[in-house]
């Protein structure tokens, strides 16, 4: 008879759920069917690099929540990164980005398209629902998304990103965090 101790498979199972989250995020609805998302899973040393970049950003900008979140992600066996490029939908009538239409918005390429941000939000929601369904603790962090973009972890021209660190321990490290 084989005996498997949960502690021996914990990190492996968290990574397995991260993979399910990535697939769920990919299949989330997208405006006009246009997929501008990039979805990554990082582990090990890459999480350490991400944490170090978050600390640097926190120090450079005087933002203590970057420092708090940098510590918060270190025990995670996996972090899911989700980002989007900025591409308009070619609409003649919209204005939700603040410009009259997509042609006007195109003159300001760094200004986000609401549909890209919305698609990213749907993907994040789909991903965290998978984590919740598997009782994996998680937290959506813009701080880690910012650091991932600074580190150029994404291969594409990602301009908006979030990170979802994961944990399966006796107590969620993402819940009772100090407010800063």
Regions found by a protein language model. Name each.
Residues 1-180:
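Acidic, surface-exposed loops and disordered segments
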């Amino acid at each position: 008879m084989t005996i498997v101790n949960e502690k021996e498979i914990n990190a492996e199972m968290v990574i397995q759920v991260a993979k399910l989250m990535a697939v769920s995020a990919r299949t989330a609805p997208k405006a006009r069917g246009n997929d501008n998302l990039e979805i990554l899973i990082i582990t090990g040393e890459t999480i350490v690099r991400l944490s170090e970049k978050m600390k640097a950003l926190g120090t450079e900008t005087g933002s203590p929540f970057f420092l708090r979140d940098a510590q918060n992600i270190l025990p995670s066996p996996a972090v899911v990164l989700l980002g989007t490029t900025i591409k308009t939908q070619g609409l003649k009538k919209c204005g939700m980005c603040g410009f009259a239409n997509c042609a006007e918005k195109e003159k300001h390429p760094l200004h986000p398209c609401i549909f890209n941000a919305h698609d990213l939000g749907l993907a994040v929601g789909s991903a965290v629902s998978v984590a919740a369904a598997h009782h994996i603790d998680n937290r959506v962090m813009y701080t880690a998304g910012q650091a991932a973009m600074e580190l150029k972890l994404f291969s594409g021209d990602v301009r908006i990103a979030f990170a979802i660190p994961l944990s399966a321990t006796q107590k969620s490290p993402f819940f009772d965090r100090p407010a800063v």
